[in-house]
């Protein structure tokens, strides 16, 4: 990885170079991939658009081969539309989209591993919901996704993002931390604020084990997708 190997490195580079966190990650990715920053940004935008496509192509009729997953994302949407969700509009939409993505994964639909297939619902749910509810541009969400990617790369280098190796705290925990940093940026946080947000998110996930029913990434995995953001 170019230039940074820890969250502290990312924050210091942001402060010293007078760059926002997403710019630090973009520069590092361009260096690592031998690509222009414009091309890296375009690549990340395609990734974000793939998340959108996965959300739009959710099929409420599908069920996983085990029959344990499917249809709950639709139920959550109906509940949100009833106006009775005590969590509010934004969190309600986040929960809906996280469920949809997790169920799509269990039903063998196309998703974006972020950072893994098992945790695929967290980051898209947060970013897509923020774009929908707060009307930010797609490019702003891509910048948040770059920040999330940088955080994920640091975690993968120093620890693990695999549930099988580090428990669900490593998989859902990493996704939650990545999403928190991106969300903090869109809310106006500086690099230190983003770092604090990811730390709070990750600490709240510590201790989660990987012990799914029947060894499938369905129960409790899908429920954890919408409780972790």
Summary of predicted features, one role per range:
Residues 1-109:
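Generic N-terminal targeting/processing segments that precede catalytic cores or assembly contacts
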Residues 87, 135-141, 188-194:
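Structural helix-adjacent loops and short alpha-helical linkers that scaffold large soluble proteins
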Residues 88-105, 140-159, 202-211:
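Acidic-glycine-rich active-site phosphate/pyrophosphate-binding loop
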Residues 106-114, 130, 160-164:
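Short acidic, glycine/Ser/Thr-rich loop/turn "cap" segments at secondary-structure junctions
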Residues 111-126, 171-175:
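Conserved phosphate/anionic-ligand binding catalytic regions in large, soluble enzymes, centered on
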Residues 124-135, 183-188:
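Alpha-helical support elements that line or immediately flank enzyme active sites
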Residues 158-170, 174, 180-223:
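Hydrophobic alpha-helical bundle architecture
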Residues 226-229:
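Conserved small/polar residues in nucleotide/adenosyl-binding loops
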């Amino acid at each position: 990885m170019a230039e940074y190997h820890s969250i502290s490195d990312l924050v210091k580079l942001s402060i010293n170079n007078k760059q926002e966190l997403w710019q630090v990650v973009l520069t590092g990715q361009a260096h690592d991939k031998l690509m222009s920053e414009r091309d890296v940004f375009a690549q990340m935008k395609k990734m974000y658009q793939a998340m959108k496509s996965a959300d739009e192509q959710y099929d409420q009729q599908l069920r996983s081969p085990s029959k344990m997953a499917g249809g709950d994302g639709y139920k959550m949407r109906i509940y949100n539309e009833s106006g009775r969700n005590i969590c509010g509009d934004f969190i309600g939409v986040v929960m809906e989209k996280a469920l949809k993505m997790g169920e799509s994964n269990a039903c063998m639909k196309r998703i974006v591993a972020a950072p893994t297939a098992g945790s695929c619902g967290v980051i898209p749910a947060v970013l897509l919901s923020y774009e929908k509810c707060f009307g930010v541009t797609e490019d702003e969400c891509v910048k948040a996704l770059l920040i999330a990617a940088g955080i994920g790369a640091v975690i993968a280098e120093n620890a693990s993002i695999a549930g099988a190796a580090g428990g669900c705290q490593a998989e859902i925990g990493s996704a939650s931390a990545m999403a928190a940093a991106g969300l903090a940026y869109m809310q106006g946080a500086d690099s230190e604020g983003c770092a604090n947000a990811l730390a709070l998110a990750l600490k709240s996930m510590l201790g989660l084990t990987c012990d799914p029913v029947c060894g499938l990434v369905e129960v409790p995995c899908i429920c954890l997708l919408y409780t972790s953001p």
